[in-house]
Amino acid sequence: MSAKLNWYRITFNDTVWRFDTARGPKDGETCPLIASELFSSGLSEVFKSVTSFSEILRNMESRGYITNITLRADSDILGPGALRCEFLFPSEVFIPTSHTLKMGRSSLILEPHLVVLKECKYISSGKLDIGISSIEATSVAVLRRVKGPAFIGCMDDNPFGVLTKKPSDEKNVLASK
């Protein structure tokens, strides 16, 4: 059984997402900026009802297409010298997915708000400006020649719905046959 894959172009127009922290739960301690955990925590909060898009973004981050930098910055809330983790998004990507994504452009201002992760307090803020458009299968070959590096492959957790492990243990189902 094979799932039908739809092709999409996703653009990130001036998308900026950051997490700032001043200090840890104990005086003099700095909270670690655990980028992937902050990103996942933020995704589940921002995209509560759009789990398929959260899945794609989480996989883009874990595979290095959305990267992050750590720096000292002047935070509007925490003041100068705050430790900041800022996520850098590509300008555009082309992906096949088994999910049906809602097309259009969405802009969302992430007002500064408190995020607590592992007893550390972070201030999350930013701007998400994301466009999603569908691509006809007949156009994929031409676009791939012109915009090759922007084709990043499937970012679904399990695009074909293949059961690779038994729910009861970690043994591979195929190996047990």
From Swiss-Prot:
It is found in: Virion membrane; Host endomembrane system. Keywords: Apoptosis, Host membrane, Membrane, Viral envelope protein, Viral matrix protein, Virion. It comes from the Viruses. It is a peripheral membrane protein. Its main location: virion. One of its GO terms (molecular function) is structural constituent of virion. One of its GO terms (cellular component) is host cell endomembrane system. Homomultimer. Interacts with nucleoprotein and with the cytoplasmic domain of glycoprotein. Plays a major role in assembly and budding of virion. Completely covers the ribonucleoprotein coil and keep it in condensed bullet-shaped form. Inhibits viral transcription and stimulates replication. Most abundant protein in the virion. This is Matrix protein. The lineage of its organism: Viruses, Riboviria, Orthornavirae, Negarnaviricota, Haploviricotina.
